[in-house]
């Protein structure tokens, strides 16, 4: 099985899920339909002799394309459809075949909600520009107010089922009163890709927030790419930084100028401050500047170059210390050779504009091997290896030569990396003293700070922080399983806190085919602003494995991280930052410390309402003080303004379902680590029931008309996302999930940026055999590859002759139906016969035909993080899965179909029914 699956651990063959309605059974009855009449509209683009075509069947039948402008929330008009690869010979009545469930009915005025969404996406929030809201569609009479907020559109979750396309809608628009910002700039408010609030209309009192049962939290992702050039924002170089004397907020587009512009009133605490003398002076041109053009008054997201007083010490250089496992396991699976080659090939990509970047290397087996690398041009250019066997108190031999400047030693670093593999190629050493190596590395870089990058294939089994094999298959799926997700050795938490104080960050790259205790090791990244990257069953002999790691590690090394960073969130008087979630160390009640600030993670901050808010808007300002890779101290400031309301209907109508799901993902991980898996799953279900009950009681008049399940249009996806979370690898009830897989999933659930997290919880599925003609080709306007419309994750949407891509952002599956026609297999795989199709990890062949090129374009576009507005190093593996092929692989792919019944979990229909009963 391992060979077929390409390294997926053998124990990961999920047991045959009880009641997993296999696509085979679900479609068996459809083959007996009437013979197909007619042909595909005369299209000759893909005329396959002997193939019957139909328009309007298959998963894309009811979707057929992107949502047209003016379409209403949830109503998906049919589109012109490509004649796809359909079933061979036998026909099926298209009316029975997988027609997508109809969207819920439009509001009384067609298209209002969709237009509202589109205005929100464009940043148009002036109420005079908003379409008139239909009073007859509103729920609960509203108190008169100067600006109408978003309307509440009730829908029935049972009669109008969730459609996956709803997850692609922008959040409810932020509707601010006119004249809120000091200048009418379209960029005055923070875009959702940087900061999203769970509530886009904020209750004025704690009691109203409590009554709503909704969380008030921010999802913060200060960077939308791995490198500045990919997502430039305004940088203010003049070092004139105007801050409030009392609350220390930064001047922003929502302040008010007084006294002929000589003073400004803080929009957080109302204090009046003097405008700095140099505020209206252009230092570069040495002449007065136009204040209305200042970036900090027009842009919600800006970066200030910080003056001397923002530094505790001079900006430190970028330091990478590589701790490389050279034990028998690491040499035999190819990790040592692959990582050495990859570092060598990425030396030009490591940020080094200021030519101060420093590198160091420690090799680890049962001893520690330090390497002294001479400068280029030295008499002796050979690296020297120094072996330390005292693991309890590892000392630093000649510490001055162990961290070398990349620019000065470039050639000799390459020489060293070429020789590293040879030094250990005959090893039989099974020891791994990684804990002691971390201690030694800490001593080496603590004076300057930096990153320790661990590359390991073994369980640390000697020296500091040694761990034992504690996974017991008998406890998997039981209440005792949660203990395996806790840290086994207190060293990892206490050492992580030490690292954080010395500005040392740790990233873990873990490659074991055996148990590696990810639960313990992941504490190091968790408290130091790092990340855990997990490669189960990895082996460089499989080209796909080697290429995936090489691409990801090269991206990792080229990322422009921030150093010595702190993050703080300030807000309007009456609001308080309550709890922080993410990978960092909480240094004080409101200060998060990051020895290195990554660009591929998001953070969640829960907000408390301590006092009644009297203003029509509140502001929340995130500031990240950091040193760039190039040695410049900067402050990235992100300011978000939100309207306030005393009306519960407004709160619900402006709630952001994806931000709420992200908040509860972090809460669920916290609950797993503190109380266990079952309490976390129960808490999610209880929350879903509580929200539905509150809405019914407070806003739907308490009635249960016709046995429905009422919820607002903008939150329709929330119950589905909760179910998908409960079924995620990190939380799912199962006796088949290895502890390391689960721990790695929990790391993702608590760090992924919002778009990637939602996709990880509710993966994307695209029907490829019948995708629209424009799919897989560049859009005429944007040049971006067009994706087919997404399909709900249910086996009812899968036809036996179909080809589907299922993608959760970490792994991609190409599902080939058991009745796929030969021409489809020939076009996509270049194989005339289905029996020749190899399953498992692979890359699609590049063939000279239109359809193969489009399928490959869709697969590649689905991996494109930049178009999602996030940075990520991940390159998902592609697994080819045959519907009637290798069972373990097929069952793994089917766990992505979160709307189906599986293993020990319910289907979406059963879940909605149980929520209905409890409500």
From Swiss-Prot:
<dbReference type="Pfam" id="PF04811">
    <property type="entry name" value="Sec23_trunk"/>
</dbReference>
<dbReference type="GO" id="GO:0090110">
    <property type="term" value="P:COPII-coated vesicle cargo loading"/>
</dbReference>
<dbReference type="GO" id="GO:0000139">
    <property type="term" value="C:Golgi membrane"/>
</dbReference>
<comment type="function">
    <text>Component of the coat protein complex II (COPII) which promotes the formation of transport vesicles from the endoplasmic reticulum (ER). The coat has two main functions, the physical deformation of the endoplasmic reticulum membrane into vesicles and the selection of cargo molecules.</text>
</comment>
<dbReference type="InterPro" id="IPR036180">
    <property type="entry name" value="Gelsolin-like_dom_sf"/>
</dbReference>
<keyword id="KW-0472">Membrane</keyword>
<dbReference type="Pfam" id="PF04815">
    <property type="entry name" value="Sec23_helical"/>
</dbReference>
<protein>
    <recommendedName>
        <fullName>Protein transport protein sec24</fullName>
    </recommendedName>
</protein>
<dbReference type="Pfam" id="PF04810">
    <property type="entry name" value="zf-Sec23_Sec24"/>
</dbReference>
<keyword id="KW-0333">Golgi apparatus</keyword>
<dbReference type="InterPro" id="IPR012990">
    <property type="entry name" value="Sec23_24_beta_S"/>
</dbReference>
<feature type="binding site">
    <location>
        <position position="244"/>
    </location>
    <ligand>
        <name>Zn(2+)</name>
    </ligand>
</feature>
<dbReference type="GO" id="GO:0005801">
    <property type="term" value="C:cis-Golgi network"/>
</dbReference>
<keyword id="KW-0862">Zinc</keyword>
<dbReference type="InterPro" id="IPR050550">
    <property type="entry name" value="SEC23_SEC24_subfamily"/>
</dbReference>
<keyword id="KW-0813">Transport</keyword>
<keyword id="KW-0963">Cytoplasm</keyword>
<keyword id="KW-0479">Metal-binding</keyword>
<keyword id="KW-0256">Endoplasmic reticulum</keyword>
<feature type="binding site">
    <location>
        <position position="266"/>
    </location>
    <ligand>
        <name>Zn(2+)</name>
    </ligand>
</feature>
<dbReference type="InterPro" id="IPR036465">
    <property type="entry name" value="vWFA_dom_sf"/>
</dbReference>
<dbReference type="GO" id="GO:0005789">
    <property type="term" value="C:endoplasmic reticulum membrane"/>
</dbReference>
<dbReference type="GO" id="GO:0000149">
    <property type="term" value="F:SNARE binding"/>
</dbReference>
<dbReference type="InterPro" id="IPR006896">
    <property type="entry name" value="Sec23/24_trunk_dom"/>
</dbReference>
<dbReference type="Pfam" id="PF08033">
    <property type="entry name" value="Sec23_BS"/>
</dbReference>
<dbReference type="GO" id="GO:0030127">
    <property type="term" value="C:COPII vesicle coat"/>
</dbReference>
<comment type="subunit">
    <text>The COPII coat is composed of at least 5 proteins: the sec23/24 complex, the sec13/31 complex, and the protein sar1. Golgi apparatus membrane; Peripheral membrane protein; Cytoplasmic side.</text>
</comment>
<dbReference type="InterPro" id="IPR036175">
    <property type="entry name" value="Sec23/24_helical_dom_sf"/>
</dbReference>
<feature type="binding site">
    <location>
        <position position="247"/>
    </location>
    <ligand>
        <name>Zn(2+)</name>
    </ligand>
</feature>
<feature type="binding site">
    <location>
        <position position="269"/>
    </location>
    <ligand>
        <name>Zn(2+)</name>
    </ligand>
</feature>
<dbReference type="InterPro" id="IPR006900">
    <property type="entry name" value="Sec23/24_helical_dom"/>
</dbReference>
<dbReference type="Pfam" id="PF00626">
    <property type="entry name" value="Gelsolin"/>
</dbReference>
<dbReference type="InterPro" id="IPR006895">
    <property type="entry name" value="Znf_Sec23_Sec24"/>
</dbReference>
<dbReference type="InterPro" id="IPR036174">
    <property type="entry name" value="Znf_Sec23_Sec24_sf"/>
</dbReference>
<dbReference type="GO" id="GO:0070971">
    <property type="term" value="C:endoplasmic reticulum exit site"/>
</dbReference>
<keyword id="KW-0968">Cytoplasmic vesicle</keyword>
<keyword id="KW-0931">ER-Golgi transport</keyword>
<comment type="similarity">
    <text>Belongs to the SEC23/SEC24 family. SEC24 subfamily.</text>
</comment>
<feature type="region of interest" description="Disordered">
    <location>
        <begin position="1"/>
        <end position="43"/>
    </location>
</feature>
<dbReference type="InterPro" id="IPR029006">
    <property type="entry name" value="ADF-H/Gelsolin-like_dom_sf"/>
</dbReference>
<dbReference type="GO" id="GO:0008270">
    <property type="term" value="F:zinc ion binding"/>
</dbReference>
<dbReference type="InterPro" id="IPR041742">
    <property type="entry name" value="Sec24-like_trunk_dom"/>
</dbReference>
């Amino acid at each position: 099985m391992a060979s077929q699956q390409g390294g997926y651990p053998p124990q990961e063959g999920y047991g045959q899920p009880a009641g997993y309605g296999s696509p085979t059974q679900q479609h068996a009855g459809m083959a007996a339909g009437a013979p197909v009449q007619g042909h595909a509209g005369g299209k000759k683009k893909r005329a396959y002799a002997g193939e019957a075509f139909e328009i309007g069947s298959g998963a894309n039948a009811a979707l057929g394309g992107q949502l047209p402008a003016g379409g209403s929330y949830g109503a998906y008009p049919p589109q012109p459809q490509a004649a796809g690869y359909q079933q061979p010979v036998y026909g099926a009545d298209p009316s029975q075949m997988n027609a997508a469930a109809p969207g819920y009915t439009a509001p009384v005025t067609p298209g209002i909600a969709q237009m509202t969404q589109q205005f929100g996406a464009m940043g148009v929030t002036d109420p005079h520009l908003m379409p008139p809201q239909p009073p007859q569609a509103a729920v609960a009479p509203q108190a008169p107010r100067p600006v109408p907020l978003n309307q509440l559109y009730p829908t029935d979750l049972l009669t109008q089922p969730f459609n996956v396309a709803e997850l692609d809608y922008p959040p409810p628009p932020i509707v601010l009163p006119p004249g809120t910002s000091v200048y009418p700039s379209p960029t005055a408010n923070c875009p959702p890709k940087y900061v999203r609030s769970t509530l886009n209309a904020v209750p004025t009192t704690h009691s109203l927030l409590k009554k709503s049962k909704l969380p008030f939290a921010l999802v913060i992702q200060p960077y939308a790419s791995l490198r500045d050039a990919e997502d430039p924002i305004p940088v203010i170089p003049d070092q004139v930084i105007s801050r409030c004397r009392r609350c220390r907020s930064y001047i922003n587009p929502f302040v008010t100028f007084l006294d002929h512009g000589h003073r400004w009133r803080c929009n957080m605490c109302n204090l009046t401050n003097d405008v700095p003398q140099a505020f209206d002076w252009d230092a570069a041109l040495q002449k007065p500047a136009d204040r209305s053009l200042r970036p900090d008054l027009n842009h919600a997201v800006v970066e200030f170059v910080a003056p001397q007083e923002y530094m505790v010490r001079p900006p430190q250089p970028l330091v990478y210390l590589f701790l490389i496992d050279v034990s028998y396991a690491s040499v035999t699976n190819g990790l040592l050779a692959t990582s050495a080659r990859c570092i060598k090939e990425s030396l030009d990509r490591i940020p080094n504009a200021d030519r101060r970047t420093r590198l160091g290397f420690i090799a680890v087996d049962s001893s520690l091997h330090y390497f002294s690398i001479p400068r280029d041009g030295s008499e002796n250019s050979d690296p020297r290896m120094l072996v330390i066997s005292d693991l309890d108190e590892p000392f630093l031999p000649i510490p001055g030569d162990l961290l070398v400047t990349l620019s000065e030693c470039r050639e000799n670093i390459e020489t060293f990396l070429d020789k590293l593999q040879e030094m250990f190629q005959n090893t039989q050493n099974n020891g791994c003293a990684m804990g002691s190596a971390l201690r030694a590395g800490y001593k080496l870089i603590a004076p300057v700070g930096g990153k320790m990058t661990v590359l390991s294939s073994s369980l640390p089994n000697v020296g500091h922080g040694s761990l034992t094999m504690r996974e017991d298959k008998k406890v998997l799926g039981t209440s005792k399983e949660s203990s395996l997700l806790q840290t086994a050795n207190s060293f990892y938490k206490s050492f992580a806190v030490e690292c954080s104080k010395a500005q040392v960050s740790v990233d873990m790259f873990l490659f074991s085919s055996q148990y590696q205790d990810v639960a313990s090791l992941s504490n190091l990244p968790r408290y130091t602003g790092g990340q855990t990257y997990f490669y189960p069953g990895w082996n460089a002999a499989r080209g796909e494995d080697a290429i995936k790691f090489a691409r990801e590690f090269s991206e990792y090394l080229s990322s422009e991280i921030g150093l010595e960073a702190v993050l703080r969130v300030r807000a309007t008087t009456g609001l308080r930052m309550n709890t922080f979630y993410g990978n960092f160390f909480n240094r004080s009640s409101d200060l998060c410390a990051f020895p290195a600030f990554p660009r591929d993670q998001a953070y969640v901050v829960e907000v408390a309402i301590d006092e009644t808010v009297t203003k029509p808007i509140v502001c929340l300002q995130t500031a990240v003080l950091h040193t760039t890779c190039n040695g410049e101290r900067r402050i990235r400031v992100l300011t978000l303004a939100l309207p306030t309301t005393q009306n519960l209907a407004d709160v619900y109508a402006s709630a952001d379902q994806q931000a709420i799901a992200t908040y509860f993902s972090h809460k669920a991980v916290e609950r797993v680590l503190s109380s266990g898996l079952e309490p976390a799953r129960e808490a999610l279900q209880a929350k879903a029931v509580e929200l539905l009950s509150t809405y019914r009681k407070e806003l739907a008049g308490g009635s249960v008309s016709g046995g429905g399940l009422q919820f607002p249009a903008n939150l329709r996806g929330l119950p589905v996302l909760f179910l998908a979370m409960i079924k995620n690898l990190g939380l799912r009830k199962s006796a088949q999930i290895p502890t390391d897989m689960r721990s790695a999933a929990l790391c993702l659930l608590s760090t992924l940026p919002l778009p990637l997290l939602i996709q990880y919880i509710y993966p994307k599925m695209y029907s490829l055999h019948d995708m629209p003609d424009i799919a897989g080709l560049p859009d005429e306007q944007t040049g971006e590859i067009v994706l087919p419309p997404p399909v709900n994750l249910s086996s009812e949407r899968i036809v036996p002759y179909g080809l589907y891509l299922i993608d959760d952002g970490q792994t991609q599956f190409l599902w080939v139906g058991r009745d796929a026609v030969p021409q489809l297999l020939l076009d996509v795989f270049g194989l005339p016969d289905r029996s020749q199709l190899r399953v498992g990890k692979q890359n699609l062949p590049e063939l000279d035909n239109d359809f193969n090129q489009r399928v490959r374009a869709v697969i590649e576009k689905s991996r494109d993080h930049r178009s999602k507005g996030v940075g990520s190093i991940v390159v998902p593996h592609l697994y080819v899965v045959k519907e009637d092929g290798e069972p373990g692989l097929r069952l793994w792919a089917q766990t992505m179909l979160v709307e189906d019944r599986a293993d020990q979990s319910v289907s979406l229909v059963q879940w909605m029914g149980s929520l209905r009963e409890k409500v």
